[in-house]
Amino acid sequence: MRFRYFLVKKDWRSTMVQNSCWQSKSHKVKAFTLLESLLALIVISGGLLLFQAMSQLLISEVRYQQQSEQKEWLLFVDQLEVELDRSQFEKVEGNRLYMKQDGKDIAIGKSKSDDFRKTNARGRGYQPMVYGLKSVRITEDNQLVRFHFQFQKGLEREFIYRVEKEKS
């Protein structure tokens, strides 16, 4: 690309500058206008505010779920304690606790699914006490029955209960 230089003895540089300005005026330069820039800033700001609001909502939901799990555990422990208080301990066998309640043989332990149930001694009947269990380990040692619970969500809890064996 060759440029034409107008040779004017007096000031050839000013003529060249005028020529280049004239050329740039004839071509449209693509750029953002002030209105477009303002609109882009508003869209970006709105997107960031939306992202912040969604993050706070997610954090509050996680906190609620953690509190809900804790409340569910406390409710289960209260229910289990009531069942154990009104029963007479017999034995722990096969990861199940066997006891007598109101003259009936009762067993509590983890079922084949993901819940902890109260059943009769033969495994019949159905009263779920807590859901979402991965595993349960029930052991008895020196009049202490230990329940070790692992939940599917990663929560681990242990419940220890003192029993009195009936003297024969």
UniProtKB/Swiss-Prot annotation:
The gene coding this protein: comGF
Its biological purpose: Required for formation of the type IV-like pilus (T4P) that plays a role in transformation. Transformation pili are dynamically extended and retracted, perhaps thereby promoting DNA uptake and transformation. Involved in transformation. Required for DNA binding.
Record's bilayer topology term: Single-pass membrane protein
Residue stretches spanning the membrane: 31-51
InterPro entries listed in its UniProt record: Competence_ComGF (IPR016977)
Source taxon at top rank: Bacteria
Keyword vocabulary terms for this entry: Cell membrane, Competence, Fimbrium, Membrane, Transmembrane, Transmembrane helix
GO terms, biological process: establishment of competence for transformation
Quaternary structure and partners: The transformation pili are flexible filaments, consisting mainly of the major pilin ComGC and smaller amounts of the minor pilins, including at least ComGD, ComGF and ComGG, and perhaps ComGE. Interacts with ComGD. Interacts with ComGE. Interacts with ComGG.
Subcellular location(s) of the protein: Cell membrane; Fimbrium
GO CC term, one of those recorded: plasma membrane
The name this protein goes by in its record: Competence protein ComGF
